[in-house]
Regions:
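Short Gly/Pro-enriched loop/turn and capping motifs at secondary-structure junctions
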Residues: 71-73, 101-104, 127
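Conserved anion-binding
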Residues: 1-73
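Catalytic cores of alpha/beta
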Residues: 1-8, 82-120
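C-terminal helical cap(s) of enzyme catalytic domains, especially alpha/beta-barrels
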Residues: 5-11, 108-149
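Conserved, mostly hydrophobic/aromatic
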Residues: 19, 65, 87, 110, ...
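Charged helix-capping and loop-helix junction motifs
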Residues: 47-52, 77-86, 135-139
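RNA substrate-recognition surfaces in RNA-acting enzymes
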Residues: 76-77, 130
Length: 149
C-alpha cells in the first residue's frame, strides 16, 4: 500500500526505514512465474512480483531491504539461489537476505550470486541456536569474503 508507505516515510524519514519483504516462489497456470511478496504469515500472495522495477519503486521509501526467502526460511537446508541472484544483480541499496543458510558453502554462494551486494542473516543453523555453524567461524568467513570485495 503506497499510501501507507508515504505516511510512514513522512513520519520517520526514509533514512530510518528498512522494508521487510517476504518472498515466495509462485508457478501456476495463468500467472507469471517468479518470486512474489506474501503477507499474513506468508500465506497470502500479493500481485507484487519481485522485479528490478519493483525494487526501484520500493527503494524510494527506505534505505535497506530485509528479504525473507520464505520457502526455505527456518529450514537450514539451502538458499534460494534464483532470488539471491535477482537481488544481487539489482544491488542499488543494502539488502539483507534471510532464509535457508546452513553451510559455509551457502555463504560463498550468496557472495557470488549476490554479486557481493547482499548481507545475510543466519538463524537456526548457528551453533548458538543449536545448529552446526560455529558463530565465531561464521564471523571470520564473512570477514574473509568481505576482504575479497
Amino acid at each position: 500500500n503506497y499510501e501507507n508507505l508515504d505516511k510512514i516515510k513522512k513520519a520517520v524519514g526514509k533514512e530510518h526505514l528498512v522494508l521487510d519483504l517476504s518472498c515466495r516462489y509462485r508457478s501456476e497456470p495463468g500467472k507469471t512465474s517468479g518470486y512474489y511478496i506474501v503477507t499474513d504469515r506468508w500465506q497470502k500472495y500479493t500481485d507484487e512480483m519481485v522485479t528490478p522495477e519493483l525494487l526501484d519503486e520500493l527503494s524510494r521509501y527506505c534505505v535497506e531491504f530485509l528479504v525473507h526467502a520464505v520457502d526455505v526460511e527456518g529450514k537450514a537446508n539451502g538458499i534460494e539461489k534464483p532470488l539471491a541472484k535477482l537481488l544481487g544483480d539489482w544491488g542499488k541499496i543494502p539488502i539483507t537476505y534471510a532464509g535457508g543458510v546452513h553451510s559455509f558453502e551457502d555463504l560463498k554462494e550468496l557472495a557470488d550470486l549476490g554479486c557481493n551486494h547482499l548481507n545475510v542473516t543466519i538463524g537456526s543453523a548457528l551453533d548458538i541456536f543449536g545448529g552446526t555453524m560455529p558463530y565465531q567461524k561464521v564471523l571470520q568467513e564473512i570477514s574473509d569474503l568481505n576482504k575479497k570485495l
